[in-house]
Amino acid sequence: MYKISELIKGELCFFPELGYGFYPVPPDRPYDENYFEKYQKLADTEMGREITQSRMDLVNRHYSGELCDVGIGCGQFVESMGCYGYDVNSSGIEWLKKRNKYRDIYRAPVGALSFWDVLEHIDEPEKAVAMAKEWVFVSIPFFESAEHITGSRHFRKDEHIHYWTHEGFIRWFSLNGFSCEEFNDAESEIGREGIRTYAFRRVRNANQITTS
């Protein structure tokens, strides 16, 4: 006998009514020096520079103040924007500390946080966005169904834990106290596949949020 409760521990679960999917990524993840170097190569291209500029433009349309980029990739956005950064990759942490740009977002709230292709990697994303006092900026793959997820290049069993539909993502942020002020497909138009970018503004404090 094979229990459903055991099956779902190793497979994608998708909840259409929530617009949300979950994959149990193992704790041993590939965030090391090679990972950092891979993103250095991706950033040092015309497309990489266009994407960074698009992200800067999004932030600047809505916010001016203290910003921390969570999951810095190779640091291109941090360097271009002149903001702080947070990472779990030792290479990223070292890069930030050398430039006096490291900020542990879980120690104290920050005016705004950015998560460029990052939120889907975080085990408890609600704890991360809770540390934003005013704004959260995100780029993330979006999906329509479980079949869309499993057929996508963004279905990464060693990295991506969370999978949202567009509606599910906005709903999830609303439940966490944020209003969607803008979304666009600029990164997909530049050449990426199935990526949407969002600007969320805090409208309720964490202690005002209920689960009812």
Where are these regions (language model features)?
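Conserved N-terminal segment of class I S-adenosyl-L-methionine
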Residues: M1-A112, W116, E126-M131, I149, ...
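Residues lining the SAM
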Residues: W116-L119, S139
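Conserved beta-strand signature within the Rossmann-like core of class I S-adenosyl-L-methionine
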Residues: E134-S145
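Helix-to-beta-strand junctions that scaffold the AdoMet/dcAdoMet cofactor pocket
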Residues: I122-D123
